[in-house]
Amino acid sequence: MSIALFLQRQWVRALLALFFGACGTLAYSPFDHWPAAIVSLFGLLSLTLNRTTKQATFIGFCWGMGLFGSGINWVYVSISEFGGMPTAINIVLVILLAAYLSLYTMLFAGLLARLCPKATWWRLAIAAPVLWQLTEFLRGWVLTGFPWLQFGYSQINGPLRGIAPLLGVDGITFILMAISGLLVYACYQRRIVAAIIALALLLLPWPLRQIQWFTPEPERAVNIAMVQGNIAQSMKWDPKALITTLQIYLDETRPFMGKAPIIIWPESAIPDIETDQNTFLTMIDGLMRANHSSLITGIVDAKRQPEGQGYQFFNSIIVLGDKDTYQYPTRNRYSKHHLVPFGEYVPLESLLRPLAPLFNLPMSSFNRGDYVQPPLTIAGFNLTAAICYEIVLGQQVRDNFRPETDFLLTISNDAWFGHSIGPWQHFQMARMRALELGRPLLRSTNNGITAAIGPSGEILAQIPQFTQQVLEVKVTPTTGITPYARFGSWPMWIITLVLGAFTLYCAIRGRSDKH
């Protein structure tokens, strides 16, 4: 049997789809092999050629299982450590999550085969990027969304990184799909022109890396200290460990008071209700002010509801030691808007909470803050804030960005995911936000990766994971507005709409030619 005939078998293509999907994980941190993104997408597009809609749909699902099964397996760490369920059930839950995310790649492959059954250039170079943009949007929106593992992030160190300040991560993903499609067309139809165009799309954006969309302000450079407490997740919400936790952060902070005007503690560094820590917060506020430093810290806010309706809890950031003396409730604060299902709130709460510890984790009853909130002000600087998972949401970060923003800030606690690849992927996505908006980004975490990122997405300084130490770094604020900061995703959606209309025209004309 020839290799060509062997590759026509559906089960062979399904297995290859799993392989090519898994290859895509190598494009992301900590591996950072950006060409793997093109290889993975090339595999998806080539394997769905000459397939019926049903066959292509299954291949798309298998490819998604390869990508998400390997790329988000870090979810298993938190489920197994804190979910309180048998190993078999933990594995099944991770498979179910990967299967759910694979529904979107399945939808992509099915629509592509249905609308464009022939291996034409417009199917591979135009229809594929358009449909991918649409299905990726759905993945980031349906059921609150999970826009993890977008291929554009793989280019943070790649040749297409210069696209980010123009069109954001979606624009990079769009071009990657077009390049992959052209390469498939070049191989399948033996058209050297398609390969040349693909190479041009890959290399022509390279000079864009040299454009500086921002203006540094070296005269305003400031020393910043970010404290990495390395508190074990098992101790995080233990009332018996509260005093020890606060003492760790205070002891690590003292040497930098008066030395660093801005000191940052990570997400829920103070693992208690804000009003219950009034004495401690007042003491820290006075201590900071006396030493001419200011502190940003994560904490839990509880707001009493009227008419005996209890409290609303918020995952918040507050500022201490700045211009105004601390007195609850301060106005200089940020409350997390995009909450993580099961981690910060539980859907169908009354039904699911009794079933297993996974659905009844500590502090999993948060409420949303406003979608758009004013920047934090500290030591004369404006910071656009995002807590943990929110830094993945490019549109939300952009919508909160202001022309007067000096720094981006994200605080996080990735202790849930242990020594897995999850924190590295999270870190990579944070770097993209700095590149898109042309601002330095300060990332303070409980156990890593704590880092300062430059306005071009470069790593200025970082400290190792799973260590208790402080990152001290001098960071220069920037001004200026990138095209992406000014226009957001609108240019990308206009491109998608125009090329989508062209795709529909070609599909309708192709069907009429048949008849």
UniProtKB/Swiss-Prot annotation:
GO terms for cellular component: plasma membrane. It is a multi-pass membrane protein. It is found in: Cell inner membrane. The active site is at residues 267, 336, 388. The chain crosses the membrane at residues 14-34, 59-79, 91-111, 124-144, 163-183, 192-212, 488-508. Gene3D superfamilies: Carbon-nitrogen hydrolase (3.60.110.10). GO terms for molecular function: N-acyltransferase activity. InterPro entries: Apolipo_AcylTrfase, C-N_Hydrolase, C-N_Hydrolase_sf, LNT_N. GO terms for biological process: lipoprotein biosynthetic process. Its EC number is 2.3.1.269. SUPFAM superfamilies: Carbon-nitrogen hydrolase. Residues 227-477 form the CN hydrolase domain. CDD domains: ALP_N-acyl_transferase. Pathway: Protein modification; lipoprotein biosynthesis (N-acyl transfer). Keywords: Acyltransferase, Cell inner membrane, Cell membrane, Membrane, Transferase, Transmembrane, Transmembrane helix. HAMAP family: Lnt (MF_01148). PANTHER family: APOLIPOPROTEIN N-ACYLTRANSFERASE (PTHR38686:SF1). Belongs to the CN hydrolase family. Apolipoprotein N-acyltransferase subfamily. Catalyzes the phospholipid dependent N-acylation of the N-terminal cysteine of apolipoprotein, the last step in lipoprotein maturation. This is Apolipoprotein N-acyltransferase. It comes from Yersinia pestis.
